[in-house]
From Swiss-Prot:
Its cofactor is Mg(2+). GO terms for cellular component: cytoplasm; microtubule. GO terms for molecular function: GTP binding; GTPase activity; metal ion binding; structural constituent of cytoskeleton. Tubulin is the major constituent of microtubules, a cylinder consisting of laterally associated linear protofilaments composed of alpha- and beta-tubulin heterodimers. Microtubules grow by the addition of GTP-tubulin dimers to the microtubule end, where a stabilizing cap forms. Below the cap, tubulin dimers are in GDP-bound state, owing to GTPase activity of alpha-tubulin. This is Tubulin beta chain. GTP binds at residues 11, 69, 138, 142-144, 204, 226. InterPro entries: Beta-tubulin_BS, Beta_tubulin, Tub_FtsZ_C, Tubulin, Tubulin/FtsZ-like_C, Tubulin/FtsZ_2-layer-sand-dom, Tubulin/FtsZ_GTPase_sf, Tubulin_C. Dimer of alpha and beta chains. A typical microtubule is a hollow water-filled tube with an outer diameter of 25 nm and an inner diameter of 15 nM. Alpha-beta heterodimers associate head-to-tail to form protofilaments running lengthwise along the microtubule wall with the beta-tubulin subunit facing the microtubule plus end conferring a structural polarity. Microtubules usually have 13 protofilaments but different protofilament numbers can be found in some organisms and specialized cells.
Amino acid sequence: MREIVHIQGGQCGNQIGAKFWEVISDEHGIDPTGTYHGDSDLQLERINVYYNEATGGRYVPRAILMDLEPGTMDSVRAGPFGQLFRPDNFVFGQTGAGNNWAKGHYTEGAELIDSVLDVVRKEAEGCDCLQGFQITHSLGGGTGSGMGTLLISKVREEYPDRIMETFSVVPSPKVSDTVVEPYNATLSVHQLVENADECMVIDNEALYDICFRTLKLTTPTYGDLNHLVSAAMSGVTCCLRFPGQLNSDLRKLAVNLIPFPRLHFFMIGFAPLTSRGSQQYRALTVPELTQQMFDAKNMMCAADPRHGRYLTASALFRGRMSTKEVDEQMLNVQNKNSSYFVEWIPNNIKSSICDIPPKGLKMAVTFVGNSTAIQEMFKRVAEQFTAMFRRKAFLHWYTGEGMDEMEFTEAESNMNDLVSEYQQYQDATAEEEGEFEEEGEQ
C-alpha cells in the first residue's frame, strides 16, 4: 500500500513527532505496547501506511528519530508511547548542535547523516509502494534546521520521485528561543525552497493564540501546542489510512496546491476547535466547519490570510457528511470571498472526504492553504536576518564551522526572491489587457 516514512529531527521535531504518534495510534486502536485493541476492521485495513507489522502481531511505527544529543530521545523513550518505536531507529550523537545551523548541516550533522540514511533506506526497502517522506523539525534551532535540511537533500538525491513533505516550525514573531533563529531559519528556507515538495508552516505564537483564544487554556504547555499540530498532521494523511468518498494523498495534494514549483509553503488549520466547556453548545455542521476553517484565527502560522490572496486551498473533511453539501459550501466560500482568491485559477479549492472522523468527534476538517500572505512571515525573518547580518553579528559561530559569508548572502537573496514571487502573483489579475478593452466599449 502507499507507505509513508516519518522522520523527526531535533528537539522540536521529536516532541511534535512523539505527540503525532500518540494521536495516530489512538486513531488506529494501538496501545503503547504496539498491540491492537480497536473496534473496527477499518482501523487495520490500511494500517501499513504508518506502521510495520512485527512478529506476534505488534505494530511498529515507520518512524526514524534523529538528534545530535541524547536528551530529547530519552524523554521520548520514557514517554507514554516510548516503547512503541523500534530501538534501532533512534539515531543520535552526543555533542549537540548548540542552535548552530552550520554544526547541524556541515560538521556534527554530516558525521551522523550516513547512519540516519541507512535507517531510512532500510525502512524504504521494506515498503511495498513508498508514497513519500514526512519530516517534523523546527527551523530555528541547529539540528532540526541544519541536519534536517541536509537529510532532505540527501533523501531527495536518492528518491527523486517521492513526495517530500515537511512540517516546519518557524521562529515566531514575539516568542524567541534563540538569538540566532533568523540565521538558522533563512539558511533552512534556502534549502526547503529547492528540495522539499510541500512545507506545512507552523509557528508557536499562532498555536499559543489558538490555545488562549479558542481553547481558553490559561497556561498552554508545549504538549497542548503539539497536540494541535498532530491533529492537523493526522488530517493530511487520513485519506491514505481510511476509506473515503473523495480520496486525496500527498501527491494529489501537491498537484492541486502548487501552481509554481517554488511556492510550496502552506498554512494549515484544523476545525472544530472549541474550549472544553463550550463543546456541548455547538452543533457540528459542514457550514460551521467551513466557517471556522477559513477563519484567520484558526491558522497555525502567524500570517493573516486576509492580507493576501489564496492561490489554492485544500479542505480535507473527515466524518459522515454529504458530498453535495461540501461542494456547495466550498462554492459558497469562493463566491462570497472572491477577493481573497486569485481569479486566474478558477475553482481553486480542492476538497476530499474521508469517512472516519478523529477520536471523539463526529466530523472534522483539516485545511491546507497556499496563500500569498505567507510572505509576511518570510519578510519578518528576513528583516531580523538583515539587521544582524549587516553588522556580521554571531557570524563567527558559522564561519568557524567552515561556512562562507557568501552562503548567507545567497540564502538572503533567495528568500527575498521568494517574497517578491508571492507578491507578484498576489497582484496579478486574470486579464490585464482585457480591462482596457472594456473601458473603450462603454
